[in-house]
Design a protein with these regions (language model features):
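Noncatalytic scaffold domains of N-terminal-nucleophile
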Residues: 1-22, 26-109
Length: 109
């Protein structure tokens, strides 16, 4: 095996390595590592957060960036935000729909 898995927690790293040992690819390992990291250290990432990835597909000339950050809720439109010069961090309008799961799906596809 000529792969490497690195994460902030040994259990997350072990999960990624195990995926590679079972025949998964780097994307599979990255997703598994990220999911486990969200369980063992939820303050660092997880299902309720966003996902950003820099991915290089074998044979491509350059990597691409996946931005799976959250988006506004379905009832939010520009007119509902126009009265704010700044939105307080503890205001409901400052919360986005988490993008991590959508990012895992996009990476897998």
């Amino acid at each position: 095996m000529s792969n490497i898995v690195v994460s902030p927690h040994n259990l997350s790293t072990k999960a990624g390595i195990e995926i590679l040992r079972q025949g998964g690819n780097a994307i599979d390992a990255a997703i598994a590592t990220n999911i486990v990291q969200g369980v063992v250290a939820p303050e660092t990432c997880g299902i309720g957060g966003d996902l950003f990835a820099l991915i290089w597909i074998n044979g491509e000339t350059k990597p691409f960036c996946l931005d799976s950050s959250g988006y506004a809720g379905s009832n939010v439109d520009i007119s509902s935000l126009s009265s704010y010069s700044d939105i307080p961090l503890d205001h409901p309008m400052s919360v986005t729909v988490p993008g991590a799961v959508r990012g895992w799906y996009a990476m897998h596809e």
